[in-house]
Amino acid sequence: MQVTDVRIRKITNEGRMKAIVSVTFDNCFVVHDIKIIEGQNGLFIAMPSRKTPEGEFKDIAHPINQEMRDMVQKAVIEKYEAVISAGE
């Protein structure tokens, strides 16, 4: 499975959340509402989630292994940095 498109849908400079993105896989499956967060060790992605009645956040969709998570995160952050650089 490959990342075939990354669309930056919203960019913000407020708080730790920097952008919301949609990622398409193999030109046939899309995951919306992936967040780019600025953490203590740099940018990372947070998968779409919902709040349970108990107040916990549970991922709606997420990679099941580290290799896939790394691939998605790399593609998303590279696209975000390219968009930010182009806007400066």
Curated annotation (Swiss-Prot):
Alphabetic keyword roster: Cell cycle, Cell division, Septation
Its family remark reads: Belongs to the SpoVG family.
Q: Which Gene3D superfamilies match?
A: Stage V sporulation protein G
Q: What is the annotated role of this protein in its UniProt record?
A: Could be involved in septation.
A Gene Ontology annotation in the biological process aspect, one of them, is: sporulation resulting in formation of a cellular spore
Provide the species name.
Answer: Caldicellulosiruptor saccharolyticus (strain ATCC 43494 / DSM 8903 / Tp8T 6331)
- Tell me the PANTHER family matching this sequence: SEPTATION PROTEIN SPOVG-RELATED
Pfam annotation, one family: SpoVG
User: What NCBIfam families does this protein's entry cite?
Assistant: PRK13259.1
Tell me which InterPro entries the record gives.
SpoVG, SpoVG_sf
Q: Is Cell division among the key words of this record?
A: yes
What is the recorded name of this protein? Putative septation protein SpoVG
* Spans traversing the lipid bilayer: none
